[in-house]
């Protein structure tokens, strides 16, 4: 029974959303969330209306440093996302790149950033294998986004409170970090099958330059 429920949740989480909540605006047949859930253990997101718990030992919060977390690049080298880079960063968090909603979110980051990619570091984090991320970037012709994987140590989801507990996938979110590694914007999408408001995140990032 548990396996069946998880399979249904996975299908709901990774597919495009058929329903369009009244609080969302629609973008290319996918709803765009205007509200945010709270990250961290004890909080929930939903999958087509079904609540699922978030877990983690920490939580990402506006006004605080982005938690230290090692992820893996497409070159298989570790990267500490909590390290100060001296650049403004937009971190787009997706459950899996091989799905319509995640695909749309990543293309918007890459192609509809209004030139921010010349001065802001664009990052996508998922628990896809680095090989799958590299293939996605190549096939999508995306060269201005850094793809990082949380598949191995799973530190990013744990440190930021963004792990969907029943599935061990990352919740859908977008985070803006300033040049000093302080979180300036967080949106955790309440309904995983909806898109985050990427334009709102980009507006915040633009104001930090």
Give residue ranges: language-model regions:
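Structural microenvironment flanking redox-active thiols in thiol-disulfide oxidoreductases
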Residues: 103-142, 147, 155-156
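Short, basic/aromatic recognition patches
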Residues: 158-164
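Thiol-/selenol-based redox modules, centered on thioredoxin-like
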Residues: 171-209
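Short, small/polar residue-rich loop motifs at catalytic or cofactor-binding pockets
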Residues: 65, 88, 169-171
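Short acidic-hydrophobic, aromatic-tinged amphipathic segments that line or gate anion-handling sites
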Residues: 72, 146-150
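N-terminal targeting signals for export/organelle localization
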Residues: 2-9, 13-68, 72
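Short active-site neighborhood of thiol/selenol oxidoreductases, capturing the structured segment around
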Residues: 79-109, 121
